[in-house]
Amino acid sequence: MNDLPFFTAADGMASLVLREIPRRGTAYVVVRCVFGSQEGLLRDCDSFCRSAGAIEILYSGNADFSGFSVAACLTERALPRECLPETAAAAVETKDSRWAELYNECFAAVPAARTYNAVPEGAYFVYDGKTLIGLGQVCGDEIAAVASLQKGRGRDCLCALAAKIEGSTVRLLCAEENLPAVRLYDSLGFSRGAVRERWYRRK
């Protein structure tokens, strides 16, 4: 399902992210501008997204969401790589289609997480010896994703992926609603930076 970068209605313009509907049932509305009634614009966006099969709709962008509840808050976290503990685990770059399948399973319940139909650039499996313990994605100096496939191995997965970044500072985004991840990053001493994305839902 294709996204609509420019959805124009009588009351404004928005971008509709529809690609997550087939798997997650979620559509994302990014308000670009309102030149009439905000509620009128959102109502038109809702109608289109529902007709495309959306069960849940999340909102962001240039609008007043004070009457909405926060669905996901993505915060920048950072830590000098030298501050991370050593690990025997190793991250190995992969093009194996299993990566996308496992990623989608791991992040199915994480708000605003994307779905992969193919293996992206910078995809890694994390091994302890010959045992697969996790997966992740590295983009430059940022860990774009990390997931443990074995309970209690999140720290090892993170440290193994950190060895693959460019630069000396490990950067990542963390959904504040993903409490296990928040606890892990807090325990390692990651700083809390700016909120990069915030998504809302109707109350």
Task: Please tell me what each predicted stretch does.
Residues V30-A88, R196-R201:
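Acyl-donor-binding surface of acyltransferase catalytic domains
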Residues I57-Y59, I143, V170-C174:
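Conserved hydrophobic beta-strand within the GNAT/NAT acetyltransferase core sheet
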Residues M1-A10, C106-G129:
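Active-site rim helix/loop that mediates acceptor-substrate recognition in acyltransferases
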Residues A63-F68, L184-Y185, F190:
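Conserved active-site tyrosine of GNAT-family acetyltransferases
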Residues S37-F48, Q150-I165, V182-S187:
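Conserved acetyl-CoA-binding loop-helix of GNAT-fold acetyltransferases
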Residues M1-S47, D128-Q150:
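Conserved donor-binding loop and adjoining core beta-sheet/short helix segment
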Residues A72, L132-G134, A194:
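A structural microfeature
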